[in-house]
Amino acid sequence: MTKPKHRRGFRFYASIYRKILVQDLKSKMSYRADFIISTIGMIMTNLSGFVTFLILFKNFPSINGWDYHHMLFLYGFSLIALTPVQCFFDNNWNLRFQVQSGDFIKYCFRPINVFFYFMSEVFDVKGLGQLAFGVGTLVYAWVNIGIPVTPLVIAKLILFLLTASLFMIAIMNAAAATCFWIVGSGYVMVIMFRFKDFAKYPSSIFHGIFRILFTFVIPIAFVAYYPSLAILESESVPVLTWCAPALGVLFFYLSYKFWMLGVRKYDFTGS
């Protein structure tokens, strides 16, 4: 399916997003009990990771050179990096249902970018609980490690957190887009999302095959490990860490083009 291109400026899309976001939040706030319960569930899930490290490091002083606080730093970093995909791109989970039912066609006739329109319909506020927990964990680890707080370090932290976010967003975009070609593609989304659990561990602890897999095939190592080394390491920072920002933008762009390719190939129910 082809559709005319509509070029709009940032202010236009920001205005549209604000209006859609307000309506979505109003809808969610009408079910406050569900929101509170789901947010508590999100925090408890993340807390379990914290407790796991606490128990683990009571028995082992370090894992392949990573001590308790460095592992917590990586964990907090990964939680913050995963927040954008949780908050802003959660509608990817609904894509296959919209495609299978034929309801997705409604997005194809609006004079705005289909990808933007579809993603903007859902904002997962539970992700804010994850963000708060991630920030708390990162700050706690930061203080105990003794990382200096300078403008340069803060700038690197922001840059590499954004970089890490792009990788997970891209992974989920690509996984969701498979529904345009594969019937019952939900398992692809589930598998790719489960891989995020490996992001909280340093890539160096895995077997060589898995290091290659998580670096060059399914780049989970870029969701936290490689970007965080820009903050944790003052010397001997891997080349892949410095390449991460450019690779993140490229990977996100490719996932977006793949998603939009699916839109162009889309045949709605009854066509």
Q: What positions do the PLM features span?
A:
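Hydrophobic transmembrane alpha-helices and immediately adjacent juxtamembrane helices
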Residues: 2-271
